[in-house]
Swiss-Prot record:
Binds 1 [4Fe-4S] cluster per heterodimer. The cluster is bound at the heterodimer interface by residues from both subunits. GO terms for biological process: light-independent bacteriochlorophyll biosynthetic process; photosynthesis, dark reaction. This is Light-independent protochlorophyllide reductase subunit B. Belongs to the ChlB/BchB/BchZ family. It comes from Heliobacterium mobile (Heliobacillus mobilis). Component of the dark-operative protochlorophyllide reductase (DPOR) that uses Mg-ATP and reduced ferredoxin to reduce ring D of protochlorophyllide (Pchlide) to form chlorophyllide a (Chlide). This reaction is light-independent. The NB-protein (BchN-BchB) is the catalytic component of the complex.
């Protein structure tokens, strides 16, 4: 148990409700204090439920704390069974019920003889387990409870393990993976937990292969199905060119299908991905830029691979999944200058500030930190804001997800640079006509400082050294004149006879602080 005002991972309750709430005809009774009803709000707001979410709170109040809460729980379970008529009722423990040492299994055994629904108590530790561990354990528990031997489908088919409500773009990812598999000639037998029923769980064994889409949870259920029913599985989060191609090849090998033409089709020189990665625009905007990555295991690893593939330098990559530290180090070794595991958001915030990256890829908390320090940011992992639960298709996985992410990274870096420069040096005076704009562009070009061997400093004039000249040429033309004038004014006021890189950086810091003071 950890006392904190920000946690990257949710509680065990969050994990259990993500699994149970994603299924059909499954109702969850939460045995805890009034505050644990937050789960209903999350589903209503983030997933935009048009019906009441399938959660009922068996409230532990002052009376229950003094006299015991068993009677309240029994009454709640009976009411849920009569009113909602689910196939399964999940009685989930909370920290409060654990403190009261309530024997929920005994309640389930007694009530199970009186209810039509099957009663299940998740085998998790409400104090110790966090969201993804609870998801993994509970998903394995219900698969073990309901999966039965079934004949295989005639067509090669797979089960998709992992997509659920409240996951980061997971429902969009599910549709993209379905589309990819359909293009390869592979059928989807079942998806769990999203949209799954008891019948779905019973028919899992019809599939020839299980695909665990996220490393954080689901692999234990795949292991169970392999040991008990002999179903092979792969664990893959296909983000980026290399990981997506490996994913497609792994499916092709197990299905006995040719997949090379499909990969070539998506990576063809005339295709969107190849045209973007090899374009002058991409090379000038992305190549050599400095990025930092932080998130859950799957998305942090995938995004690090993707950034390296497009020429972006990853200064550091981190994850908050402390239990997966060794695997994380092995998956990113050599792709980032520094690889680490940390769940302290303040430490990550300070690390972002000290690194001064061109772009931040992280969670909602890193978005706040990046905004505080004026760095462009993309949210690539949960925990996320409602903005990252879009109505329009926005996958992260597969070739379509890669295309979307490339577009997002490119535009974020460009717009972030423009805003940063304008904030530093200001905009030119308003009211300038098209003719004046063209004349200023010509003037800026003609006024560009030359290399030091071709420039002499007269009275009142400043000489720019070669490095400073090169740096100025890299500034976009629409603010280049302002940058040059402000830098030279700064240098003259302080008695410099030559503009160097150090002078440029000092001027940058001066005007940036001046701009921030003006905003305040």
């Amino acid at each position: 148990m950890k006392l904190a005002y920000w946690m990257y991972e949710g509680t065990a309750l969050s994990g259990i409700t993500r699994v149970a709430g994603s299924m059909q005809k499954v109702h969850t009774v939460i045995h805890g204090p009034q505050g644990d009803g937050y789960v209903n709000v999350m589903y209503s707001m983030l997933e935009r439920f048009h019906t009441i979410p399938p959660f009922t709170l068996s409230t532990i109040g002052r009376r229950e704390m003094a006299q015991g809460s068993r009677a309240r729980l029994v009454e709640t379970v009976r009411r849920v069974d009569a009113q909602h008529q689910p196939d399964v009722i999940v009685i989930t423990p909370t920290c409060s019920s654990t403190l009261l040492q309530e024997d929920l299994l005994a309640v389930a055994r007694t009530l199970g003889k009186q209810t039509k629904a099957k009663l299940i108590v998740p085998n998790v530790n409400a104090f110790r387990d966090l969201e993804h561990r609870a998801m993994d354990d509970f998903l394995t528990q219900i698969v073990a409870e309901f999966a039965t031997e079934q004949p295989k489908t005639e067509q090669f088919s797979v089960n998709l393990i992992g997509p659920s409500y409240l996951g980061f773009h997971q429902l969009h990812d599910m549709q993209e993976i379905r589309s990819m598999l359909e293009s390869l000639g592979v059928a989807v037998n079942a998806v769990i937990p999203y949209g799954a029923s008891i019948k779905t769980l019973q028919e899992l064994t019809k599939a020839h292969l299980n695909i665990c889409l996220y490393h954080e949870y689901g692999q234990s259920a795949c292991e169970l199905l392999k040991e008990k029913f002999g179903i092979d599985y792969i664990v893959a989060t296909p983000i980026g060119i290399r990981l997506t191609s490996q994913f497609v090849k792994a499916i092709g090998e197990r299905a006995g299908l040719p997949v090379e033409s499909y990969i070539r089709q998506n990576l063809a020189p005339s295709g969107t991905i190849a045209r973007f990665t090899k374009s002058v625009d991409s090379l000038s905007a992305l190549f050599g830029k400095r990025a930092v990555v932080f998130g859950d295991y799957s998305h942090a690893v995938g995004m690090t691979h993707l950034l390296r593939e497009i020429g972006v330098r990853v200064v550091w990559a981190g994850t908050y999944m402390k239990t997966m530290e060794k695997a994380f180090q092995a998956s990113i070794g050599g792709l980032a200058d520094e690889v680490f595991v940390c769940d302290d958001f303040q430490e990550i915030s300070h690390k972002i500030r000290d690194t001064h990256p061109d772009i931040v890829l992280g969670t909602q908390m890193e978005r706040h930190s990046a905004a505080r320090f004026n760095f462009p940011c993309i949210v690539i992992s949960s925990p996320a804001h409602i903005l990252n639960f879009p109505l329009f298709p926005a996958p992260v996985l597969g070739y379509q997800g890669m295309t979307r992410m490339l577009d997002t990274i490119n535009s974020t870096i460009k717009l972030g640079l423009e805003e940063h420069l304008v904030n530093m040096f200001g905009e030119d005076s308003p009211g300038m006509g098209e003719e004046d704009t063209a004349q200023e562009q010509v003037a800026v070009t003609s006024d560009m400082p030359k290399a030091p061997d071709k420039t002499t400093a007269g009275e009142g004039e400043l000489k720019w050294d070669a490095e400073a000249t090169k740096a100025l040429k890299q500034v976009p033309f629409f603010v280049r004149g302002k940058v040059q004038r402000n830098t030279e004014n700064y240098a003259r006021e302080r008695g410099y006879s030559e503009v160097t890189l150090e002078v440029i950086y000092a001027a940058k810091a001066y005007f940036e602080s001046k701009s921030n003071q003006g905003e305040r």
